[in-house]
Each structure stands twice: as structure tokens, then as C-alpha cells.
Amino acid sequence: MCIRDSPAPSSTQLCQGPLAAPHDPAEQVNRGIFAFNRSLDDYLLAPVARGYRHLPGFVQGGVHNFVANFGEPKVFINDLLQGNGQRSVTTVGRFALNTTVGIVGLIDVSGRLGIERHEADFGQTFGVWNITNGPIVELPLLGTGNLRDATGKALSFAVSPFGSSSDTVDTLSTLNTVGGIVDGRAELLPLTDQLRTEPDYYAALRDAVAERRAHFVTEGKLGEQLDLARHCGGNDER
């Protein structure tokens, strides 16, 4: 378990967002990949996500809950790596309750009982460990982010907390992947629709992601989920 040796961020540090503009030395290459990603999004992902948002609320809720629950074991791993013991206990409790009583996570029983979910990933963990952001990397299909987060994504793909593969696990994993892509894209539609109105969509999206990830790392360092809009008087929240 990693024990943090850095002080918690002050309120001023928390609300000021990233300390510097994202470092994007390969911007021209990144913009080329971004153009490919945008075409894929414009003609496939975004239309599917918009259609998904017209499904009944209970269907969308079930998909969202299933995807969130399937990811809880990786959240637990990162809670431990970040030294967030209380959060790890909460994650285990949520996963056990929702997987059983909540029918493999389709119903967020824990949330109804006041046991709120939080997110954690390897990119956040690296940030909690004070590993630097690194340059911006636009990845095909995966989008924009810094090198630290890109490495975290690669590690997440490689880690399988469910152990040996089986037909059941493979099926659930496939459903989780497809559901996660569609549900996640639908969740981001309001943000991306707003950013598309900016003169430079690439830069606007890159900077918005950088700010949100900086706040996400702060959550990991503090060991709690933050309402940044309320805490900072209008700043973006994750």
C-alpha cells in the first residue's frame, strides 16, 4: 500500500485547476489523430449515444449501474494503492451488495442506502504518487489525455481483477465494454456539445480534460469526492 507523503492541497490549490497549460509538444500529430477520432465520433459514437439517451430511464440506469459495478474491483485496487483505506472498504461493500442484492449491479442498492460510489483509476493513482503529467497524447479511439493517464489506461486494460477467464466473465466483460462506451459517451454529450461551439474544439476539449483530471487527482489525494462547482463557486466539477 502506498502511503502518501505529500500534504493535502489547500483550498486555493484545489480551485485553481491545472498549474500550467497542458504540455502539447506533438500538437500537430495529436490534431491529426484527433481529426480521425472526431470523424469516428461524429458518424458513429455520438449518434449511438444520442439514441441511447432516448431509451427509458430504467434501461439507461441499469446499464450505467452495471458498468459502474463491474469496474469496482479496479477502483478497489486503486483505493489501496492510493492509501485510501476507508474508500477501499466502501468500494468492497458496494460491490458485494450490488452484485448480490442488486442483480450483478443492475440496481444500485448501495446508493439507495446512502453508500455513495466514487471513481478511481491508475492515472489518478499515478497523480497521487506525484508522478508528473507528461506531454499530451491523443490516442486513436481513446481520445486526449496526458502521458500519465494514457499509461494508466494501458495498465487498466492489462489488469484483470476477476482472475482466470471463463465464458461468464468474458460475456460480462464484453457487455461492460460495449455498455461503458455508449453510456460514457452519452454522459459526456452535454460537455462536448458545449465545447464544439468553441473556435478551437481540439484545444477546448484538451484543456477541459486536463482540468477535470487535475481535480480528479486532487480527490484522490484528499480521499474524498468533491463538489468543485459548489466548493469553488462555479468551477467545473468532475
Task: Please state what every model-predicted region is.
Residues C2-G85, L175-R238:
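N-terminal targeting leaders of membrane proteins
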Residues L55, V59-Q60, V89, A96, ...:
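Alpha-helix boundary/capping detector
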Residues N65, N69-L147:
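Mid-length scaffold segments of soluble, non-membrane domains
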Residues V109-R112, T125, N130-G220:
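Surface-exposed interaction patches
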